[in-house]
C-alpha cells in the first residue's frame, strides 16, 4: 500500500519543473498512490512518450520516504496540493506544484488562511530611493486588519529589504526560496 503524501512528494521530485505531467497522471488515474500501484511498466504503455515515467518506481518511493523523514527531523513539512492548508490562489494556477516545503514558527492555518499576504518583488540592484520606498511601504503594514504577511524571495535587494523591514516592524514574513529549503542563497540571508 502506498502513502498518498509520499507519492505526491515523489511526483513533485520527479516532475517538479513539469507539474502538469504530475497533475495529468493523478487526474487520469485517480490518485498519486494509484499511479505508483499501477507501476511504471503499465504507465509507459499508457503514456509512451512522457519523460520521467520510468522513474515512478518503488526505489524512488523509498528514496522519497527517507527524504521526508530527514526533512521532518529538520522541522520542514511538505504540504501536498490536496491539503486544506495549501494556498487556494496558488492552486488556481494550472501548473502549481504537487506540494510546498514549509519551515515555520507559525501554525499553517495562520500562514496560509488567516493572513492577508502581500508579495514584494523587485530588483536585486535596489537604489537608495527604491530601498526607502520599500521600507516605507512595508513599515505601513503593522496594525492592518486582517493581519498581513510579506511574501518575497530572500534575494539581495528589494526582497531582503522587505523581509528585514517586516521583521523590524513585527510583520510576519514568508520566504519563497527557489533554491530549496535546506540551502538558502545567498547564504548570509
Locations of regions flagged by a protein language model:
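Glycine-biased, small-residue-rich flexible motifs in mid-sequence functional cores and linkers
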Residues: 1-2, 80-189
Amino acid at each position: 500500500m502506498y502513502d498518498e503524501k509520499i507519492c505526491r512528494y515523489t511526483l513533485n521530485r520527479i516532475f517538479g519543473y513539469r507539474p502538469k505531467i504530475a497533475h495529468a497522471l493523478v487526474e487520469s488515474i485517480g490518485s498519486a498512490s494509484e499511479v505508483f500501484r499501477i507501476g511504471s511498466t503499465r504507465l509507459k504503455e499508457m503514456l509512451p512518450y512522457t519523460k520521467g515515467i520510468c522513474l515512478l518506481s518503488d526505489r524512488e518511493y523509498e528514496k522519497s520516504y527517507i527524504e521526508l523523514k530527514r526533512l521532518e527531523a529538520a522541522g520542514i513539512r511538505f504540504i501536498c496540493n490536496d491539503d486544506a492548508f495549501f494556498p487556494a490562489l496558488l492552486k488556481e494556477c494550472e501548473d502549481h506544484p504537487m506540494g510546498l516545503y514549509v519551515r515555520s514558527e507559525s501554525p499553517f492555518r495562520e500562514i496560509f488562511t488567516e493572513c492577508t499576504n502581500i508579495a514584494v518583488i523587485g530588483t536585486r540592484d535596489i537604489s537608495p530611493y527604491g530601498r526607502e520606498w520599500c521600507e516605507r511601504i512595508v513599515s505601513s503594514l503593522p496594525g492592518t486588519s486582517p493581519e498581513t504577511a510579506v511574501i518575497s524571495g530572500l534575494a539581495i535587494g528589494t526582497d531582503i529589504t522587505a523581509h528585514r523591514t517586516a521583521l523590524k516592524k513585527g510583520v510576519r514574513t514568508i520566504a519563497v526560496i527557489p533554491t530549496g529549503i535546506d540551502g538558502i542563497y545567498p547564504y548570509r540571508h
